[in-house]
UniProtKB/Swiss-Prot annotation:
The gene is dnaK. GO terms for molecular function: ATP binding; ATP-dependent protein folding chaperone; unfolded protein binding. The modification Phosphothreonine is found at residue 201. This is Chaperone protein DnaK. It comes from the Bacteria. Induction: By stress conditions e.g. heat shock. Keywords: ATP-binding, Chaperone, Nucleotide-binding, Phosphoprotein, Stress response. Gene3D superfamilies: 1.20.1270.10, 3.30.420.40, Actin, Chain A, domain 4, Substrate Binding Domain Of DNAk, Chain A, domain 1. SUPFAM superfamilies: Actin-like ATPase domain, Heat shock protein 70kD (HSP70), C-terminal subdomain, Heat shock protein 70kD (HSP70), peptide-binding domain. Residues 628-642 have a biased composition (Acidic residues). Belongs to the heat shock protein 70 family. InterPro entries: ATPase_NBD, Chaperone_DnaK, Heat_shock_70_CS, HSP70_C_sf, HSP70_peptide-bd_sf, Hsp_70_fam. The lineage of its organism: Bacteria, Pseudomonadati, Pseudomonadota, Gammaproteobacteria, Thiotrichales. Residues 609-642 are annotated as: Disordered. Acts as a chaperone.
Amino acid sequence: MGKIIGIDLGTTNSCLAIMDGKTAKVIENAEGHRTTPSVVAYTDSGEILVGQAAKRQAVTNPDNTFFAIKRLIGRKYDDKAVQEDIKKKVPYAVIKADNGDAWVATKEGKKMAPPQVSAEVLRKMKKTAEDYLGEPVTEAVITVPAYFNDSQRQATKDAGKIAGLEVKRIINEPTAAALAYGVDSKKGEQTVAVYDLGGGTFDISIIEIADVDGDNQIEVLSTNGDTFLGGEDFDLALMNYLIDEFKKEQGIDLHNDKLALQRVREAAEKAKVELSSAQQTDVNLPYITADATGPKHLNIKVTRAKFESLVSDLVMRSLEPCKKALEDAGLSKSDITEVLLVGGQTRMPLVQEKVKEFFGKEPRKDVNPDEAVAVGAAIQGGVLAGDVKDVLLLDVTPLSLGIETMGGVMTKLIERNTTIPTKKSQVFSTAEDNQPAVTIHVLQGEREMASANKSLGRFDLADIPPAPRGMPQIEVTFDIDANGILNVSAKDKATGKEQNIVIKSSSGLSEEDIEKMVQDAEANAEADKKFHDLVTARNTADNLIHSSRKAIQELGDKVTAAEKEKIEEACKELEAATKGDDKQAIEAKTKALEEAFAPIAQKAYAEQAQAAGAQGGAKAEEPKKEEDVVDADFEDVEDDKK
C-alpha cells in the first residue's frame, strides 16, 4: 500500500506533507519552496502553469490566471458572497453554469468548474510527492475550512478525483493544526483554541487534547467561522486604498485597467507582508498607466498604523465567531489553556494583539502557520494507513442539518458541533389526507426559516397508502460519515418502502462530469508532456547552433570555407525547424548538424592534443617546489549560511 499524503489546499497557498517514519515532513516543490501558490494559468500556447510560474505571469495574463478559486468551490453563482467577490476582486470571468454553480471561463470561452481548476494544484502536489517518494501516489487526506458546508466538501473531493487522487478523508483545517500540535505536545490534558485566518477563509475551533489510555485523543468541542474572510480581503482593502490615493493625485481610476489592477494587487500583498515587520513601506509602481500628458507612476508611502486602520474591521469580524465557538463549547475564555495561530494572515501584529486581548493569553509562536495544517493532514493519513497508532481524532459537523417541514420551517435532526460520524432518525408524517408522496427537502444551516438555509438536495418517497393526515409514519434518517458528508434516507414504516439520497452531487458535478474532467486532465497531462518535450528539443537545438557557430569562429583558418558553409547551412535548417512544432523534424535537423560538425570537432581536438603534447615535452623540467602551498581548514557551509 502506497503512502497517504496530506494536502492543505489553501486559498492563497497550498502545502504538502507525508509521514516519514513516525514524523510528518513537509515536502518542497520542484522550485524548492515549502508552499505552492494556489494559482493556475492557461497560456496562449495552450500550456497550463501552476504555482509560482502561474503567479509570475499574472500581470500580463490577468484574464486567464485563476487565483482564490477556493472561494468559489461548491458555491452557487447567485450567492451574495460570490457576487461581492465578482464585483470587488477577480480580473477573470466568473459565470453561471447550467446547474446554477459559480464556474470560471478563460478569455477564449473555455468554461471550467472550480474543482477542475483546483485539481491542477492537487496534481502538482501529487507529482511533488511522487518525485520525492519515487513511487505512484493515489491516496490523500485533504483539508477544508471547518465552516465549509456539504457542497464545498464534496466539491473538494471531486477536485481530488479529477487530479487522480482517492480522497481517503476530508479533515477540518483547525483540527489538522491541533493534530499537528497535539501529537508533538506532551502536556497532558489541554483545551486549545485554534484561530485559523488563511488567505480566503476564517475558522475558530475549540479542541480538547487528552491522554486516554495512552492514546492522544483530540476532540473538537465546537467550531465556527466565516468562509469569506481572509488575507485576500486584507489585500483588497490596501489595494483599494492605493487606487483611491492614486486617483486623488492623478485623476485616473485604475479599477477598469486589468493589467494595472493586477500590478497593484501584487504590490498590496507584498506591502502587507512587509508591514508585519516594518513600521512603513513604499509602494512604487513606475509606468502604472498613461494619459495624454504621458506615463504615470504610482508612489505611495504606507505606514503600519494606516494599514491597521484599513483592516481593523476585518480583524474585529473574526472575534464574533470566537465568542460563538466558546458559547457552543460551554466554556469561558479562562478555560482555554493554549491559543494556536494558523494561516499566513496571523503573522500580522494587529491580529496577534487582538487575539491576545480576546483570550487573555499570549498565542503560541512555535507552530508554523503555513505548514501545521498539511502536517496534521499527513498525520491523519498515517492514522488511516495504520502507521500512526496512538491518535484518536473526534471531529464535528460545523452546521446543523435537517429537513423542511410544514409551514416552511427547518426541523433539525443533527445539531451543529455534533461529533462525527453520527446517525440520527426522526419520525414525520403527512400534512394532508390520503397524501400519496412526501418530498424530503434536505437543508444545512442555523435559520428557522427553511428558505434561509442552504439546500443540499431533495427526493420523493412515493406510493404511501391512503390514510388520514398524521397517520403514516415516515422515518427520516441522517447519516454523516467521517468526512462530514451526508446520506439521507426516508422509510414508510407501514410498507417498509425506502428511498435515500447521498448528498454527493451537491457540488453540481455528476459522476459523468467528473469522469469527463478526469479524462480531460489526463489528456492535458499528455499534451503538457508533448509541449515539454518540444521545448526541450528546441533548447537542445538552440544550444547546439550557438556552440557550433562559436566553435567555427574560434577555429578560424583551421576550418575550410566548404566546411564553414556546410555547418552554416545545417544551422539555418535547424533554426527553421525550431520555429515549427514538429519535434521529430527538430531532432532530425539537430542530428544532421551534430554529424556535420563531428569531423571538424575531431580534427580540432586531434590538433589540440598534438600541440599540448609538444608543449608538455618542451617543458618536462624539474617540478616546482611546493613552498607557496598554504594549509587551510575547510568548513562545509549549509544552505542557510550561504
